[in-house]
Amino acid sequence: MAFDKDAFLTALDSMSVMELNELVKAIEEKFGVSAAAMAAPAAGGGGGAAAAVEEKTEFNVVLLEAGANKVSVIKAVRELTGLGLKEAKDLVDGAPKNVKEAVAKADAEAAVKKLVEAGAKAELK
């Protein structure tokens, strides 16, 4: 049976909140899935001494200041993050802010380089 996606969305649009809740529960039961948001596992607290010796593998890219060429910095932020124009502008206007979080060192260094080339002041943390 072919079911048109647009017809399905129209049917969903006409449902009440209670009906949508029942639909979610039925889908969970039918397919054995959960609609709960996936959470990242918490880090274990047992290896404190070993963790201090290991090299840091995840970095945050922090935009410190937009500089004089704000438009170029906004474009660079959009390329790096995939944010929309308004969101990227808000991020740049609210500096200092994290542009990217928990990324590999090479990716973080490339992101900082791109921001600096656009005229911003950025750093790794």
Swiss-Prot record:
Cellular component GO terms held in the UniProt record: cytosolic large ribosomal subunit
Ribonucleoprotein as UniProt keyword: yes
Alphabetical UniProt keywords: Ribonucleoprotein, Ribosomal protein
Gene Ontology biological process: translation
GO molecular function, one term: mRNA binding
Assembly with partners or alone: Homodimer. Part of the ribosomal stalk of the 50S ribosomal subunit. Forms a multimeric L10(L12)X complex, where L10 forms an elongated spine to which 2 to 4 L12 dimers bind in a sequential fashion. Binds GTP-bound translation factors.
Family: Belongs to the bacterial ribosomal protein bL12 family.
Protein role: Forms part of the ribosomal stalk which helps the ribosome interact with GTP-bound translation factors. Is thus essential for accurate translation.
UniProt-recorded name of the protein: Large ribosomal subunit protein bL12
The species this protein was found in: Methylibium petroleiphilum (strain ATCC BAA-1232 / LMG 22953 / PM1)
